[in-house]
Amino acid sequence: ILEHLSGYKNSKPVRIGNDAYHQKQNDSFGYLMDLIYQYYRLMPGTLDEIEDMWEMVKSILSTVMEDWKKPDKGIWEIRGESRHFVSSKVMCWVALDRGAKIASMLNKYGYSERWQKEADKVWQDVMTYGWKEELQSFSQTYDNMAMDSSLLLMEPYGFIAADDIRYHKTVKAVKKALLHKGLMYRYNSEDDFGLPSSAFTICTFWLIRALFVIGEKEEARC
């Protein structure tokens, strides 16, 4: 806390730093690996350059292979106890899936097969422990029944198809639980600050897209 500085409209105190810097956030590997894969997929002329990044790709995937089974703080940087967040598992699947595809691009089929097999294990794990029959929806974590907007990202990253009834039901459940006055909350579980009290803009756009891809175009427009 910097007591000697003021912010916008003389607001005080100024705070610096972020307690999340030391957290384990397993979802981050998926975003990075998807970015690397999409870059080379969309710019095939740069395929030879993949070799320059191959060591980094192997390092990332080695970590994912080791850590995907472990609890983490999740996409929202929860400061409480580490949990098995469904969205983190999904993004670990993304990392392994994209790594397998990159390995295939380089004809490194041993790596591709190994990573794809591990991706299949993650997929089955999520389907077994993330889907809740009682809710007829995926839930925020393996051990709770809360809704989370990040579940809407399962389809755009290719983890589940838009026409899969489980995704359709999850979209509906997330919307029912988290949409308030036209805006989406991130989740409805308590964190270290209590229950969420404000919306999160990007989550509203995730919902709009999700409604559109499951065929609810009128709802998406509203």
Q: What is each of the regions a protein language model found here?
A:
Residues 1-126, 149-153:
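The feature captures the catalytic groove of carbohydrate-active enzymes
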Residues 1-23, 59-71, 119-204, 222:
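Extended glycan-interaction surfaces of carbohydrate-active proteins
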